[in-house]
From Swiss-Prot:
Native species: Pseudoalteromonas translucida (strain TAC 125)
Cofactor(s) the protein needs: Zn(2+); Fe(3+)
Residues that bind 4-imidazolone-5-propanoate: 92, 155, 188, 256, 333
Positions of N-formimidoyl-L-glutamate binding: 155, 330, 332
Residues reported in the UniProt entry to bind Zn(2+): 83, 85, 253, 328
Family under the similarity heading: Belongs to the metallo-dependent hydrolases superfamily. HutI family.
Cell inner membrane found in the keyword field: no
Pathway(s) it belongs to: Amino-acid degradation; L-histidine degradation into L-glutamate; N-formimidoyl-L-glutamate from L-histidine: step 3/3
Encoding gene per record: hutI
Gene Ontology annotations of biological process type: L-histidine catabolic process to glutamate and formamide; L-histidine catabolic process to glutamate and formate
Molecular functions per Gene Ontology: imidazolonepropionase activity; iron ion binding; zinc ion binding
Protein location: Cytoplasm
Name this polypeptide is given: Imidazolonepropionase
Keyword Iron annotated: yes
Amino acid sequence: MQSATPGYELEDIDLLLTDANIATMDSAVEAPYGTIENAALAIKNGKIMWLGEQKNLPSFDVFATPTLSIKGQWLTPGLIDCHTHLVFAGSRAEEFEQRLQGVSYEQIAAQGGGITSTVKATRAADHEQLFVAAKDRLNTLLAEGVTTVEIKSGYGLDTANEIKILEVARLLDEHHPINIKTTFLGAHALPPEYKGRSDDYIDLVCNDMLDQVVANNLADAVDVFCENVGFSYTQTKRVFEAAKKHNLPVKCHAEQLSNQHGAELVAQFNGLSADHIEYLDEDGVKAMAQAGTVAVLLPGAFYFLRETQLPPIALLNQYKVPIAIASDFNPGTSPLCSLQLMMNMACTLFRLTPEQSLAGVTRNAAKALGLTDRGVLKVGARADIAHWQISHPAQLSYQFGVNKLLNLWIMGKLI
């Protein structure tokens, strides 16, 4: 928060927001949600240049400064979805119906279903088809106040198609208001042509795939699905070591279905996040706490798969591990496009508080992506700001199926 100083004047402001209640989510502000009531916020060149109680607002040119009254409603940071698989082709709706009719996942996979069907459809799609489908999904997130989204590859599973997915994600960043961060997830699943040769496939991921991804500047991070049905601890470590050589940060799909110690491994590499983590144990939590690795909860997948093993929320709180929440938007296990719904699910399914939930899609989601310029409202931060028609920030987690977004600014521009 910046207060007025004698002779200080706000000059050349692009926009001044007044009469606001602001949930800054800034841990330096002691109030719950980092709240500043009866506040104002000034934007210049896409960043916040002043924020504080309106009574302390410095003088400014009333006639030259565009001003908007928030009328006592609430401002929060723009929401951040830090884990998605948003670029893909095809649908798994028929498979969903089969599962509910009693057909096992193994039977579906034997028929060419499961992730194999998504890989086949994604390989067959061109850049434009993938772009159009993903843009529509991004528009849905944008309408709910989302300003930054992470997009993973992982449905190509060969060099050309993994590159294609990441190229589409970069194009989306150029042509969509939402800011996109990309993650290379070549080690998502074993492609059919490598059946029984998982080490050979990891060779491909660590060498040809990663080399081309880096050469074309297509990834901001590297991820691995470390699981019994994915890749082993040793294979995951190989990918992380390859990423480290290229100075790319790592993250991990860890402990979703069993404890493979992926969270401990990603912490050893000072990784950004361990995601899913239903089977995370205390040693893993300790390692994450020491490394500053974020715990990313994915309640949509938990719900859709009807899982029963809860993430160790009490341990995460005990060791003060930052908790983020994401949609995990994907066609197989979390076909949903609503970060607001995830906030409610994190509270109802995992017993997070509404304040933890909002932190999970703002401040901690930014940390999970290695971003320090967003996720909180403070002087110097990006002016990614959501304006809500709510009476209290807990309402964002309490209600679902009701979108209370009124206005959204990304880098200070009204969307």
